[in-house]
Regions:
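Active-site-adjacent structural elements that line small-molecule/cofactor binding pockets in enzymes
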Residues: 1-338
Length: 338
């Protein structure tokens, strides 16, 4: 999934009606986006209904969940779901897998997540391919002879693994087509992730997995309102991933206050604890020109794909329109001028 021109995607939260997914995905395709993803965050809708709705309304854009996790959805079910999306989209599905966030509060055991992801990938791959030899994993296994009771359209689909950690990144370097840093707009993370996946020049056998940078996006000509909205939207994610970025020093006071503010008062109050400098490392926020500059900086750092995440703008439709009509052309014009 690398080696060609940079690719661009939009990521949607799973909190809409089917008609909204159809309309927004159709608009994204119209503006030339390459990928439309649906998040798999805890307590939201599962990605599958949204992806099936998007498949009905589009014909070229790639579609997939970013991401499913094998701890709340067994790999056998994951295989069936991605096969359904691939069939509905006529071969445009990809599969995104990650360890998942917020699962500890449910008492879910995520011990040795990298190994669990490896085993989940093996189960999904065997089922899609029709390999009946079985998978003998510690966490996930498939008995010999097991197979899907329906025929997938393709024997494999592109694989994306989402992670902030070096162990799972190393796994992704050997398994995945893409690795996504979800919740980051920080150029400094790109070469670090490249090294973790084994893709830097210093590696004995460099691999080239595509690096995807995706984050909350709020683009609008009303810069003040856009950044205020972005602070609210990014606060729940910053509370999770803020500690994972070793290239950013977040003040202790911010980390200490953010979580309690979220739990006690919600994102509006927590937004007070997201300063400008931190916001720009974890979100795309501001005018179309500013967001385009952020995207170019990530591509210059070596990112292969940018995923502009929900809510996109002060309104869903307005955000997609500005991203497609102003941000994407500005980014492409800058790259072509070099």
């Amino acid at each position: 999934m690398t080696g060609g021109p940079p690719r661009f995607g939009v990521g949607f939260q799973a909190d809409k009606h089917a008609s909204d997914y159809e309309r927004l995905a159709s608009a994204a395709e119209h503006y030339g986006f390459d990928v439309a993803s649906v998040y798999g965050d805890l307590y939201f809708q599962p990605p599958l209904p949204a992806l099936l709705a998007m498949a009905r309304a589009t014909s070229t854009i790639a579609l997939g969940p970013a991401c499913l996790n094998p701890f709340t959805l067994h790999p056998v079910e994951i295989a069936g779901q991605v096969a359904a999306v691939d069939l509905a989209s006529r071969g445009r599905a990809y599969l995104g897998l990650a360890r998942g966030s917020w699962l500890g509060e449910l008492g879910i055991d995520q011990a040795d997540a990298p190994q669990a992801i490896v085993e989940a990938v093996a189960v999904v791959a065997a089922l899609l391919k029709g390999d009946r030899s079985g998978v003998a994993g510690r966490r996930f296994r498939l008995p010999p002879g097991a197979a899907l009771r329906h025929r997938p359209l393709r024997e494999s689909v592109p694989l994306l693994i989402g992670t902030w950690g070096p162990r799972l990144a190393a796994v992704a370097g050997g398994l995945a087509d893409e690795v996504k840093i979800g919740g980051s707009a920080n150029p400094a993370m790109v070469p670090l992730m490249r090294r973790w996946t084994g893709g830097d020049a210093a590696s004995a056998n460099p691999v080239r997995v595509g690096i995807v940078m995706g984050a909350v996006t709020v683009v609008d000509e009303d810069v003040r309102s856009a950044r205020a909205r972005a602070r609210q939207e990014v606060a729940p994610y910053l509370d999770v991933v803020g500690r994972f970025d070793p290239t950013v020093e977040i003040p202790d006071e911010v980390l200490a206050k953010l979580g309690p503010a979220l739990r006690e008062s919600g994102p509006s109050e927590a937004a007070r604890w997201v300063p400008d400098g931190i916001l720009d490392r974890f979100a795309f926020a501001g005018s179309p020109t500013a967001v385009a500059e952020q995207a170019v900086a990530l591509l210059d750092a070596g990112a292969d794909r940018i995923e502009f995440g929900t809510p996109h703008g002060l309104t869903d439709d307005g955000g997609i329109e500005l991203l497609g009509s102003e941000v994407l052309p500005a980014v492409r014009e800058e790259l072509e001028a070099r």
